[in-house]
Amino acid sequence: METGSTLSDIFSQLDVKMPYPPVSAKVNNKVEGLHYRVYNPKDIEYLDVTSASGSRAYTRTLFFVLCKAVHKLFPESNVVIDTPVSNGYYCDLRLGRPVTEADVDLIRSEMQSLVDRHLRIRRHQVPTDEAIRIFEDLGYKSKAMLLRTTGKLYTTYYDIEGFIDYFYGTMLVNTAQLTLFGLEKYYDGLLLRIPSRHDPTQLGALVRQDK
């Protein structure tokens, strides 16, 4: 393997059979995204969406794609990922008016378009002071305030086609890896549905409950 290859590149050169494609990996027992570059010999265990870490990476990336879709369709709005409910996540979509079924259909369609276009998800690591400036310039005041509290010298953020955001944890490397998701109107917001860890070819069962 070439020194500095990503975990994604390494997997593509291995003859390894997995029930489902990898979405992250344990490197010397520490969870890393498939963007991670390997420069020295490491113990690597690839993880799919049936693992807790893999499911979180998949879900986190869905959040990112949802945020990008909302930003394109409703640039003056805001979406907040809220509580886990009904085998998914309740999302508070702040449009300044009630959310309609038509809104949800538009967002779902835009998310699917982002997946179908097989877009790279780029990882950036910069000094935290620089990241704070970037998010302040974009008007993401709450994200900038959050970064001020991390106490870290460097911050990792991600972008899809120039749309950037900060998430704590690993992400997938391409939108095409999001093979299954659901988005539905749920009370006065959205329900983002994710694949079942027991059977990732199916969405988690929809059980309507209080958000």
Question: Which functions belong to the PLM regions below?
Answer:
Residues 36-55, 78-84, 90-211:
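Auxiliary tRNA-acceptor-end handling modules of aminoacyl-tRNA synthetases
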Residues 1-63, 67-85, 109-110:
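Ubiquitin-like/PB1-type beta-grasp interaction modules and other compact soluble beta-rich domains
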